[in-house]
Amino acid sequence: MIKAIIGLGNPGEKYKNTRHNVGFMVADLVAKSLNCDRKYREKAFSHIFECPDYDVIIAKPQTYMNLSGNAVLNILKDYKIKPSEILVVYDDLDLPLGAVRLRLKGSSGGHNGIKSIINTIKTEEFPRLKIGIGRPEKKEEVSDYVLSPFTKEEKFLLDKVLAHANECILNVLKYGIEKSMNMCNKNLV
């Protein structure tokens, strides 16, 4: 049973609409869908939204992406949650924009936020929802690409992706991860 949905991103207005912050975008949408408390609490280096109608919290670590493990470890300790009871939502360069993948566990795949979590909590055994953002087409640096906003054309598809990710998470909360995989694992283009 999932007890915490953790959306990864970077704190601050500067990063709000960037590709690297799709985890935050999904977390906000899920918090709204679950009618969670509108005011977040500062706890465990994160903004925490409590959802009294559901036995779940929504967390947005405020440690910057590469230090996400510190926040996740504190969430696990403060809320007495096991790694298998979290769902980490984050951007994935290796999936095209429009692709969503739900996984029970796995490696970091080169994602620094996931790498930080794995190194800090000492396990790869935690569920995750990967949101495809694609790779830069030109010779753009990956770091510049993930920290740039979506284009106008991409935003149209992004809205569909965020809505699908939200539905996926609602299914996970209702039916569990394994039963939700077929519904969740889609390419929307």
UniProtKB/Swiss-Prot annotation:
Residues that, per the record, bind tRNA: Y15, Y64, N66, N112
Site (Discriminates between blocked and unblocked aminoacyl-tRNA): N10
Site annotation Stabilizes the basic form of H active site to accept a proton: residues: D91
GO biological process, one term: rescue of stalled ribosome
GO molecular function: peptidyl-tRNA hydrolase activity; tRNA binding
Pfam family, one: Pept_tRNA_hydro
GO CC terms: cytoplasm
UniProt-listed InterPro entries: Pept_tRNA_hydro (IPR001328), Pept_tRNA_hydro_CS (IPR018171), Pept_tRNA_hydro_sf (IPR036416)
Enzyme Commission identifier(s): 3.1.1.29
Compartment(s): Cytoplasm
List of catalytic residues: H20
Family, per entry: Belongs to the PTH family.
Role description: Hydrolyzes ribosome-free peptidyl-tRNAs (with 1 or more amino acids incorporated), which drop off the ribosome during protein synthesis, or as a result of ribosome stalling. Catalyzes the release of premature peptidyl moieties from peptidyl-tRNA molecules trapped in stalled 50S ribosomal subunits, and thus maintains levels of free tRNAs and 50S ribosomes.
Protein name: Peptidyl-tRNA hydrolase
Organism: Sulfurihydrogenibium sp. (strain YO3AOP1)
Gene from which the chain derives: pth
